[in-house]
Amino acid sequence: MIILIDNYDSFTWNLYHFLGDLGQDVKVIRNDKADINELIDLDPKGFVISPGPGEPSSAGISVELVNECIKSSIPLLGVCLGHQAIAYALKGSIIRAKNIFHGKICEIITDEKGIFTNLPKNFNATRYHSLVVEEDSLPKDLSVSARTEQGTIMGIRHKNNIIEGIQFH
């Protein structure tokens, strides 16, 4: 089972259906409706942290969950706010983007590794965010896995765990 943390965003249900289409059993839990021990006791194959409004510091258990996934070596994918929560949990800074992107399509350039394996190096994706991971504060345990043509971080990957984040959706 995959546990999908809902940060009160309707895109959570798109992720739910995408994962289901891939044959995964998915349980959706709101970011303020469970504690970490309850989630770990469910013995999931992995977690997905959804997009949502606001900043990682106000995303319920999302940041704490990132640290638990690192400690327990549980796979994790963070999308948008979930991506930011990964960097924030490791003491990275989340800042206002130079330009706000809500429903804008941009070219994404990947490293073709991890979740980007078997995908084109470059592809178009839609962006819905006004916050980004600050490059200068990127924690040492994370590497950049994707960027825009302008260099904005669009993907991060933990160097020692199966933990990835994508800013776009």
Residue ranges with predicted function:
Residues 1-3:
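Extreme N-terminal starter segment of soluble prokaryotic enzymes
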Residues 12:
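Active-site-adjacent helical/loop segments in soluble small-molecule enzymes
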Residues 16-25:
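Two-component/phosphorelay signaling modules centered on CheY-like receiver
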Residues 25-31:
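Short hydrophobic/Thr-rich beta-strand motif most characteristic of the beta2 strand and flanking loop
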Residues 34-43:
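Short amphipathic alpha-helix with an adjacent loop that forms part of the alpha/beta core around
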Residues 42-118, 122-124:
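Cysteine-nucleophile active-site neighborhood
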Residues 112-160:
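Catalytic beta-strand/loop cores that center a nucleophilic Ser/Cys/Thr
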Residues 166-168:
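Phosphate-binding/catalytic loops
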